Amino acid sequence: MIYESTRDINRKINPSEAILQGLSEEGGLFVLRDLGKNKLDLKNLVGKNYYEVAEEVLKLFVDFSEQEIKACVENAYKGKFSNEKITPLVELNDSYVLELFYGPTSAFKDVGLSLLPQLTKTALTKVNDKNDILILTATSGDTGKAALEGFKDVERTKIMVFYPNDGVSTVQKTQMQTQEGKNTKVCAIHGNFDDAQSGIKELFVDEEFKKELLTKNIKLSSANSINIGRLIPQVVYYIVSYLELVTTDKIKLGDKVNFVVPTGNFGNILAGYYAEQIGLPVNKLICASNNNNVLYDFLKTGVYDKNRDFLKTVSPSMDILISSNLERLLYYVSGCDNVYVASLMKDLKETGRFEVTKEILNRIQEKFQTGFADDLDTKQTIKKIYEKDSYLLDTHTAVAYKVLLDKLDKEHVNVILSTASPYKFTESVYTSLNEATNEDEFTLMNKLHEQTKVAIPENLKDLDKKEIRHKDVINKNEMKKYILEKLGDL
């Protein structure tokens, strides 16, 4: 089992090395050329629990023993999710909501970032690497806290998270600023998520920087979904949701299903593509964007153009103009053409845009549909669904629900991926149901609970009473200097 870079066929490594390295030296992402060669036996998975399905999925992607895989899965999830199903499926009208927010930080990122530290520890042992790992992560809100919580006090790892100072919700910011753990560091930047992500990607290809870290016996890795070890765990919940539909007689084994996915960095929806490649019967993957609809335009026209205003929306985790995981899809739909992908990424870096061939666009459109919702659509959808069904959507799931309503396919079962608790975006959710207010987000959290009776996740209760531990704010071009200065604190 060999991974290679999306941009260079000659850069090949084993799965453990891919997990530890995160990003290829020249900036490419690691992929399996023969993805889909081995399929899941879905029939034998019917009736299995989350842990058992996860073990079968991981076998197709990592070079660990069965015992190692089992230990990784159990250590990741046992006792850490407040719902025993991990990712339960809830019926809503004629569709289904896959609730992905029962982890330690109330966002879907917990699924991948609870397992990634276990994969990282196991990979370090397998490759007999004596260096420690420095996890560098950019976040638009949810990844940061989930990564910090996942890697907190994990032996031989250090983690630094960078987030846009004015680009996350108050709850998300407070979650990160109050993070505990002797190996954690959090810093805001003046800029947006794309600035943070681009800054980190540049450090991964900065040989001088990496050599300096090696003198301290430290190697770089990432907890963003550019790391294949973050992406693979997300494949599992697509399979699990499908199997639940089968066991509850909502569909027959083999029936195709639509998945509607609120999308920013393209990792969550790409996990659905991976699931389909290993045997899941998927009709369409529906990419739901907010007003930063660069993916919507690309999936319609084949032109990816980030030369546009970056908009702050009520769904901040999707406020992204450079969707990193799209590169992996381009690799597969181009017939694993590393040279072609490298040329597209070069165009994107130099001009801010690229255009795929008509043939490749057609291949993408065979599996992907798209839609977008603006802030007004989003807030109206939250209000409409709550008043009609007493179900409270967060602002990202509401984008997906609005897109589903616009494109409703009654021939197939539709599953909406619900990516976060509504309490992570309290102000926007509260003001969707009520008049605008100047009250702080934590006051509104309690008022929203009183109004809706939806339980506040334990990790968010009393968050405002915790000690603020991380207050640093830097310019976007100061990340390298900051990391080298602060490493000694970890």
Report the location of each language-model feature:
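PLP-dependent amino-acid enzyme catalytic core
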Residues: M1-L490
